[in-house]
Amino acid sequence: YAPLDNKELSMVFQFELMNVDGAEVNKWTDQRFSLKDLKQIMSRWQVGMYQQAWNSLFWNNHDQPRCVSRFGDTSSPLCHEKSAKMLAICLHMMQGTPYIYQGEELGMTNVPFNSLDDYRDIETFNSYKQLVEIEKSVSHEDMLRYMRKSSRDNARTPMQWNKEKNAGFSEHIPWIMMNPNYQTIN
């Protein structure tokens, strides 16, 4: 539907990259992405669509954890900065139209939620109930770790505009916990 000469669709949105770390099968694990798999997916779409169709380029959306936490290294301020810049350069140097999700340009990270009560996403609650309470296949502690890594709530926290109260997002208490790093990432 997207070949340039067909004049049907002008761009392809493909989500294969969003499952590179096993998210399509089971996002509630410690599984990390394979750099080899990541490069193969990106290359396949770049080569396959070259002079054939136009691609959309993105690392994040409202249903994905923050890309710098997912594909980068946030273990130190220096690693965080270099990872965020590397991901931005990678995205912008490919053929296609880059889409930047709110906060990605700042290098916003996943939120260190500590409790089930910190979450708002229904998928997260349902998965917790299924895996921890019904199946008893995952411990409470492991599930909290998986949720910190993969919950959609990571992408749904308020934009970190500045280092003022509530990151300058609102004078009122936000609907979900602010990432405590808003003091330095804004």
What do these predicted regions represent?
Residues 1-186:
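Active-site and adjacent substrate-binding regions of carbohydrate-active enzymes
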